[in-house]
Swiss-Prot record:
Gene3D superfamilies per record: 1.10.287.1480
Gene Ontology cellular component annotations, sorted alphabetically: small ribosomal subunit
Keywords annotated in UniProt: Ribonucleoprotein, Ribosomal protein, RNA-binding, rRNA-binding
SUPFAM superfamilies: Glucocorticoid receptor-like (DNA-binding domain)
Family matches, as InterPro entries: Ribosomal_uS14, Ribosomal_uS14_bac/plastid
Protein name, per record: Small ribosomal subunit protein uS14
Gene that produces this protein: rpsN
Organism: Tropheryma whipplei (strain Twist)
């Protein structure tokens, strides 16, 4: 089990990312557009830098939804590799069977 403070911090980051997503997308579109005037691009870059650091989606960490483990996450299921194996053995994941050949 991860520290609760780390899990809570990650949840706060998700909220901040969602709050600023539209603004970040608009600024990045202005910066990337080839027809944007240089001074307009500079203004957009400055505005993007003034947004909170946690507004960037790369700062959100994928965590196991059961215990918050930060590594070895299978994003399709939202759990870590260890939890996935346990749940698969107990038959809690529909359609998942252990391979044998």
């Amino acid at each position: 089990m991860s520290k609760l403070s780390k899990i809570v911090k990650n949840e706060k980051r998700k909220v901040i990312v969602a709050r600023y997503a539209a603004r970040r997308q608009e600024l990045k579109r202005i910066i990337a557009a080839p027809g944007t005037a240089p001074e307009r691009r500079d203004e957009a870059q400055a505005a993007l830098q003034k947004l909170p650091r946690d507004a960037s989606p790369v700062r959100v960490r994928s965590r196991d939804v059961v215990d918050g483990r930060p590594r070895g996450i299978l994003s399709r299921f939202g759990v870590s590799r260890i939890r996935f194996r346990e749940m698969a053995h107990r038959g809690e994941l529909p359609g998942i069977t252990k391979s044998s050949w």
